[in-house]
Amino acid sequence: MKKYILVLSICFAIASQNAEAQNKEKKENKEGKVSAIDHAKAQFDYAFEEFAKVKASGAKGVSPRTTKGDTLVLVASKDWTSGFFSGNLWYMYELTKDKKWLEKAKEFSAPIEQEKTNGVTHDMGFKIYCSFGNGYRLTKDPKYRDIMIQSARTLITRFNPTVGCIRSWDHHAEVWDFPVIIDNMMNLELLFWAFKETKDSTFYKVAVSHANTTMKNHFRPDFSSYHVIGYDPKTGQVTKRNTHQGFSDESSWARGQAWGLYSYTMCYRETGDKKYLQQAEKIGNYILNHPSMPKDLVPYWDYNAPKIPNEPRDVSAATITASALYELSTMVPEKAVLYKETADKIMKSLNKTYKAEPLTNKGFLLIHSTGNLPAKSEIDVPIVYADYYYLEALLRKRKLNK
């Protein structure tokens, strides 16, 4: 009986909070403030214009990734970020129900199909699930299903049963024999989907093995994560613990922590295994209570960067975290309000301070992301995956508010 009353109390609290949020949004619209959706519509229309200009100049890429100076940077389908822009358009279709976005999503997804047999990368989930995965979810086009199943089959060819993980990179062979990065956890969602669609347990077993091995070897006692773990492919033993995009091997690269939070939340959703939920909560606790976390909850690019507060932020880490927290709020009744309110606070900060001015930023929605500071690459710029998880967070927030 007490548990029933507790659940009712939580539901009432969330409902009250949601009603307040909806009333505030209506008030802002009446005052003439541009809604997040209207802002996104205008920005993407502008992005299409900028994309056409760059293509007309001879650029060969298929998808916008970022900006360099005053230039829109396009990438080939093999780039790990190639699926995010079409994913953004699928989310726009879902948010608006306007078939204009459906057609644009199809258009920008199409060139990525060839990646379904590209076995030299672990990024199949990012490229295929974010594009065709959303496309199949929203249209049930059987062609999209076939593309995804083939992609999942390609991805598991990189699995080493001795290590228990999917290999991340083939490059940097001089540093690692078998590197696995925390980002790789995000690609498991494609495998869980493939298992449900085909009933082939191989997909499930590979995903669970990778998640378990990563949980064992990637995380420190405080539940912060290393970026790269090097394995001996013959013995499965850990040989190195490093970073590639963070400040140092022992630092906490902000986006890496966000990948961990998001992916273990997803693993709990797909398996029902409580150890993944516990892992997600502990990672979330580390992120949200870190002394270097700014008040607006948009982290610096690394929680241990030496010149905080004079360090670049990483908006992409914030958007991934917000999206993950919205989902996590549906899984932990006793912390539902806390997680949702925290995600709401992140989104409020993004909308207030980190949203691009209309018809600027080459059409990207958000500013101030950091891709790879040690390599002096993509520092304090818009990056397409920040927009992707921002839109996903908007969708998840909308569903919770209903």
Describe the role of every protein-language-model region:
Residues 1-31:
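Bacterial Sec-dependent N-terminal signal peptides
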